[in-house]
Each structure stands twice: as structure tokens, then as C-alpha cells.
Amino acid sequence: MGFRIRESLLLNLRKVPGSRVKARETMVSVTMATSEWIQFFKEAGIPPGPAVNYAVMFVDNRIQKSMLLDLNKEIMNELGVTVVGDIIAILKHAKVVHRQDMCKAATASVPCTPSPLQGELRRGASSAASRMIANSLNHDSPPHTPARRSDNSTSKISVTVSNKVAVKNAKAAALAHREEESLVVPTKRRRVTAEMEGKYIIHMPKGTTPRTRKILEQQQAAKGLHRTSVFDRLGAETKADTTTGTKPTGVFSRLGATPEMDEELAWDSDNDSSSSSVLQYAGVLKKLGRGPTKASPQPALTVKAKATSSATTLASTPKLRRLALPSRPGPEKKPESLPKVSILKRLGKAAVVSEAQDSQVTSTKSPTVRCIVPDPPAPLASQRPPRRRWRRTCKDC
């Protein structure tokens, strides 16, 4: 393809002799462009044969270096690049070249600072010696090199300089990144202290200063007192015994009764039950050995009548009541228990009344004896009602 372009250009030059200069300029620019693109593709890693073909296609389609970022897969297929590996390599290398061009533009835009020697030469340019030196330097300067050689050398130098600048920039960026990582302060993990958890750590003085020694002596003196109980702190000499004994106590013992009194009460109840089961019903039973009786039969009353009538004496009916047990000394009176009734009383069987318990009635006229039979006690509400009792005739009456 390159040879064909050159042949066509030579034919055009022969036909039009006046345009030889323009043709030469275009031919130089084309060869420069193709050489640049060939170098570009070689740097991308493409073999020499396909690299020449791709360079001619880029030159024919007027692709410039500023259009590298606009290349994509579709455009590469239209340009005749169909190999997928070549497409990927060209696109990657296009990004690298674009970065290098940007770096060149940045370095060219930065103005170079003039050196102090150049400033001094400019200041002293008005002197004759400086003028002579400047003229000699201008005359001794080498002639200008041809255009082709200068262009090729500048292109090669620019590529090498751009590569060096890119490498330097990459190294500088890596160093800056490392410095940033080294300067980053490591974040400390949050430590939960004992105060946050609710525990307090008290650091006691070690006794290095006189003040701390005094504090430690006071603490040791306070520890030697051994007043630990509440009674000691309040000033009490002995503690009150709040513990109860292991011996079981009853209600009467807590009220003030003694075990001896309880035994006597139990003995009396046993005697009552045994006597009531053996003896017959004889009115009110009285225990003479257990204390004085409270009720006594009242004396007979004498009634004086008129002269015509005889004086009659009326005997008062004795009051019948059951005597309770003799009272014993104690802090409080015990509640009276219900009287125990014998079987004969519950059955309602009449008992023979002894002569000692009969009431006698005397009069001045004729002595008469009356027998008073007391009524049986009323049955308790909790007991069974008595059976029908049998009537007996009193032999004495």
C-alpha cells in the first residue's frame, strides 16, 4: 500500500511540473505519519507486517494522535483491524500514549525559571565585551540540520522523553502513596475501661510522702478497733437474743402458763372422765379436795304469820350450778372449756339423790321433808339430743 501511494505521487509530479514542491511536502508528511504509526503499533506489541498495514490505513483515514481516546471496537473494524487481540492491544496503548502527550503539554506549559547567570548577561549586554562574545557565538553556531533528520530525531527524542517523564511520574506517585500510607495514624481500638463497666479501681497511696504515711496510719488504727456490729457502733454492751429456742411451745406457755399447770389440767380432765363414767348421776359433782366451793346452800327463812295462822317457814330452792376448776395464778385468764358430760347425762337417766345433797325444810308445827330433784342440764348444740327418759317413782316421796 505504501509503495502504491508513492508511485501515484510520482506520476502526479510528472504530470504537473509546477506542483513538485507541494508534492514533496505532502510526501514528507505522509512518510512521517506512517513511520510514527508504525512505531506506535510496534510499541503496542503488533508484528511488523500487520503494523505497516495498520499504519497505512490510519494515514489514509487521517487518524491523528489526538483521536486515540475516541477509538473503539467498531471504528477499528471499519479501519480493517479485525483481530481481537490487536484491537485490545491498540486501545490499551492508545490510553498510554494519550497520558504521555498530556504530560508533555503540562511540562511545556510550565515556564522555566531564568538562571542568575543569564540575568547578569542580559544586564551587562550593553558593554562592548558582551557584544563581541555574543557576535562570536552567533557566527560559531553550527548550520541547521535538514528537515527530515531533525523531524525524525525530534520524534524519537520526544518519545523517549515522554517515556522517561511517565516513568518518573509513576515513581513519584508511588512514593507519594507510600508516604501517605506511612503518615496515616493507625486508628486505636476503643478500649472499654473498668469505669464504663461499673467497676472502680482505687489506687491506694504507697506511703512515699508524709501525708500518705499519715493516711495509712489512720487506716491501720481504724482497722484495729474491730467494732463491726451495729450494737457496738450504737454503744450497746450486749446483743439482744433474737433466736428462739428449739423447744416447742404451746399457746398456754406463750400466754404465761407453766408445764406443771398443763399437767395438772390434764390430770383433772382424766379424773373427770373416769369418775363420770363410773358414778351415777347425782346432781352437781363437787370436788372437795380441789379448793373451796363457791356456792353454799342458803339458810332457811322463817316467816311469821298472824296470831290465828300458824307460822310457816319456806325453804328457798338452792341454786344449782356446775363449779369450774379452781383458778390458778397466771398472767391472763384462760378461756373456759366446755364441760364434759358423761354417758348417763347424755342418755338422760335419772340418778338417786343422796341424803347429804337433799334440802331439808323445817317448820314449828310439823316437820316435813321435801325432795327436790334437779333438772338435767340442757344438751349442747353440737351433741345428739337425749333419748326419751323413763319415769321413776321416788320411794321417799
From Swiss-Prot:
Keywords: Isopeptide bond, Phosphoprotein, Ubl conjugation. One of its GO terms (cellular component) is nucleus. It holds the Pfam family DUF5577. SUPFAM superfamilies: SAM/Pointed domain (SSF47769). Gene3D superfamilies: Transcription Factor, Ets-1. Coiled coil: none annotated. This is Uncharacterized protein C19orf47 homolog. It comes from Rattus norvegicus (Rat).
